Swiss-Prot record:
Keyword NAD assigned: no
Superkingdom to which the source organism belongs: Bacteria
UniProt keyword annotation of Oxidoreductase present: yes
MF terms (GO), sorted A to Z: glycerol-3-phosphate dehydrogenase (quinone) activity
Protein name in the entry: Anaerobic glycerol-3-phosphate dehydrogenase subunit B
One GO cellular component term noted in the UniProt record for this chain: glycerol-3-phosphate dehydrogenase (FAD) complex
Class of this enzyme: oxidoreductase
HAMAP family per record: Glycerol3P_GlpB
Family per record: Belongs to the anaerobic G-3-P dehydrogenase subunit B family.
Organism: Salmonella dublin (strain CT_02021853)
Co-factor(s): FMN
Metabolic or biological pathway: Polyol metabolism; glycerol degradation via glycerol kinase pathway; glycerone phosphate from sn-glycerol 3-phosphate (anaerobic route): step 1/1
One Pfam family this sequence matches: FAD_binding_2
Protein function: Conversion of glycerol 3-phosphate to dihydroxyacetone. Uses fumarate or nitrate as electron acceptor.
Length: 419
């Protein structure tokens, strides 16, 4: 099977890369093993929240300039501030075209409210998520009886520290009792599958209406809206106060929805989606990827003109930690890591951890190296890249988006030259 590009990994980076390549008229396939990290995320995307020295970033342009001085090997630093902003804006356009109408500005970060009621700087958020400063003074944080993925009293306690009048309440929906037989089934995603049925909408409205008459804003867990935000908009039109949603513990409704919207758009545009499959071997001859072998296709290789590695970091097994060191398991690419295992981590858990910055070694075009030699038609994107800390620097989603589009543009340019 021949393709212009085969992408190994179906997370945020892989999907955005595929969508951008389709814009250039290239035929793409994505091989994905299972759920991506988006299923376990808040559904919001960070661009750059803090510098390596811990200084918070609000002006993105100034932050990118400072980042280049502090971390010259960061993926953003390799591209330059203006290029990062341009690619980020293009990524936002792609997301919106896929149905993910996310709120945000590449030039200026905003503060979203977290499930614990604290604030986190971010780039893009779903319109349901409350953004600071809140537009209300009288707030009620509403939990769902029996739902352990969200603790209303914890969020309320944090918000009260910001001089807000915050109460808590709990709604009990007997229609959800079918899920209560097994506590592991009473999760936000399973609740959403029931509540997203249009016949159940009035039940949720009836439960929230008495609370809405006594406050200016309801904050509740995101336990509906797996496919879209239609129910949220329907409730907002009818309730006498604003309704906002907070992400829950994973799996996350908002994260799953974002992934599904991108995946459906990729397939609609003619992309080949290979779920439940796994790349077992890549044939690389003279610095060129020629064949990709997967578990499900056995002796039938995929033959791409270009290949993209979007396999993620440790969480997605894109990187594997062993006693002897860190390795990239598919091709055995060169990995940037510390000299000894003792340097992988810091003693204090909440300090920036060195292992977060481990990843494959690439050139400025994000082409990785194998035994010191660049693989000419292979690109590495997203969390598998080295040189950045997605947690401490708050840049995980941004690096995925920016590197994906940079690789896609580079591939499209080279593909045009080869025709």
């Amino acid at each position: 099977m021949k393709f212009d590009t085969v992408i190994m990994g179906g997370g945020l980076a892989g999907l955005l890369c595929g969508l951008q390549l389709q814009q250039h008229g290239l035929r793409c396939a994505i091989v994905t093993r299972g759920q991506s990290a988006l299923h376990f995320s808040s559904g919001s995307l960070d661009l750059l929240s803090a510098l390596p020295d811990g200084q918070p970033v609000t002006d993105i342009t100034a932050g990118l300039d400072a980042l280049r001085r502090q971390a010259p090997e960061h993926p953003y630093s390799r591209l330059g501030a203006q290029k990062v902003l341009t690619l980020a804006q293009q990524a936002q356009t792609l997301l919106n075209a896929s149905g993910a109408q996310l709120y945000g500005d590449v030039q200026q970060a905003h503060q979203r409210v977290t499930p614990l009621g604290t604030l986190r700087s971010t780039w893009l958020s779903s319109p349901e998520v409350p953004v600071w400063p809140l537009s209300a003074q009288r707030i009620c944080v509403v939990g769902v009886s029996g739902l352990l993925d969200f603790q209303a009293h914890l969020a309320a306690a944090s918000l009260r520290q910001r001089d807000l009048n915050v109460e808590t309440a709990e709604i009990d929906l007997p229609e959800l009792d079918v899920l209560r037989d097994n506590p592991t089934e009473f999760r936000a995603v399973n609740i959403a599958r029931l509540l997203d049925n249009e016949e159940k909408w009035p039940l949720l409205y009836d439960a929230l209406s008495p609370i809405a008459t006594n406050c200016d804003m309801i904050i509740m867990p995101a336990c509906f809206g797996l496919a879209n935000d239609t129910l949220w908009r329907w409730l907002n039109e009818r309730l006498p106060c604003a309704l906002t949603l907070l992400p829950t513990l994973p799996p996350s409704v908002l994260g799953i929805r974002l992934h599904n919207q991108l995946q459906r758009q990729f397939v609609r545009q003619g992309g080949i989606w290979m779920p439940g499959d796994e790349v077992k071997k890549v044939t690389c001859r003279h610095g060129i990827v020629s064949e990709i072998w997967t578990r499900n296709h056995a002796d039938i290789p995929l033959r791409p003109r270009f290949a993209v590695l979007a396999s993620g970091s440790f969480f997605s097994s894109g990187l594997v930690a062993e006693r002897e060191g860190i390795r990239e398991p598919i091709l055995g690419l060169d990995v940037q890591q510390t000299a000894t295992r003792a340097e992988w981590y810091q003693q204090h858990f909440f300090d920036p951890q060195p292992w977060q910055q481990f990843g494959v070694v690439t050139d400025d075009a994000f082409r990785p190296s194998l035994a010191g030699n660049t693989v000419e038609n292979l690109y590495a994107i997203g969390s598998v890249l080295a040189g950045f800390d997605p947690i401490a620097e708050g840049c995980g989603g941004g690096v995925c988006a920016v590197s994906a589009l940079q690789a896609a543009h580079h591939i499209a340019e080279r593909a045009g030259e080869q025709q």
